[in-house]
Amino acid sequence: MYDVAAIEAVFAQARQRQSSLSLLMLSTADGRSIAEASSLDADGRRIAAMANSFLTLGETVSRELKLSEADYATICTRMGNVVLIRIAAARPMTLTAVGRSELNLAVLLFHARECAQRLLPLLDARTP
């Protein structure tokens, strides 16, 4: 079991530091949502499943091209951007970060990576 309150506190801190983050979600590598902080009208369970599939596809393409391991995957639109990061915890996790259109991709990526680093110790210290 994960400390959902601690995970949500990391999300709240990230969203306080960058108010243009419209969604932060942590999900298992098989696409089940663990925790989310969102101002979007979206089904978190569906987003978790699709985000993990998209990131897994990016990782597979990277392997097929004989590139290094994929660090993240992105989706860029006029309405905002999405960054998907695999967190290499004891059990791999997916962090989904969505930024509104005024937040450029580089800044979104910075905040998503920082959030992933803050989550890692919480994920490795799971409660039985």
Predicted regions and their residues:
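Non-catalytic interaction/Regulatory regions outside core domains
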Residues: 1-29, 33-128
